[in-house]
Structure formats: C-alpha cells, structure tokens
From Swiss-Prot:
It comes from the Eukaryota. SUPFAM superfamilies: Homeodomain-like. This is Homeobox protein Hox-A2. Residues 55-90 are annotated as: Disordered. Disulfide bonds: none annotated. Sequence-specific transcription factor which is part of a developmental regulatory system that provides cells with specific positional identities on the anterior-posterior axis. CDD domains: homeodomain (cd00086). Belongs to the Antp homeobox family.
Amino acid sequence: GSRRLRTAYTNTQLLELEKEFHFNKYLCRPRRVEIAALLDLTERQVKVWFQNRRMKHKRQTQCKENQNGEGKGKGLEEGDRSEDEEEKAL
C-alpha cells in the first residue's frame, strides 16, 4: 500500500514530546499546532506520536498492576490447569 515512511524523531523532538506528554496526556489542537511548528513536524506526526505514546503508557501501567499480584496468578493457574488436563489425557 501507500504507507508513509516511519518518522525518525531527533532526540530534541523526543525530549520535547515526552516533556509535553508528562504534563498532558492529551493535546488540544492549538497546542498541537504550536508543538508541530516548534519541532518542525506536521500536526499529524504530533497527533500520532501522542496516540502511540498513550498506548505505550497504558501497556506500562497495566504491566505494573500485574506485577502487584493482581491478575498475575490467574494466567499461571490457567496455564497449569491445561497442562494437568493434558497429563490426565495421557
């Protein structure tokens, strides 16, 4: 298809985007326009970066919750159960 090339962000751009994300998970359009102009990116690049960053943030926070013991054992129990069932079948 006619997919865009992957954007390679500079360290400066990433630093600014991360800094902005730290204060605001969501951008209003005027702020997006401002950041895009500031970092010499398109609005779309800024928008997509924020979308992707929110998903990454969501994944990371879900991982942390699992490490706290919530939902961690469930996966293991399910795994063990299926192995036990396989052994019984033999």
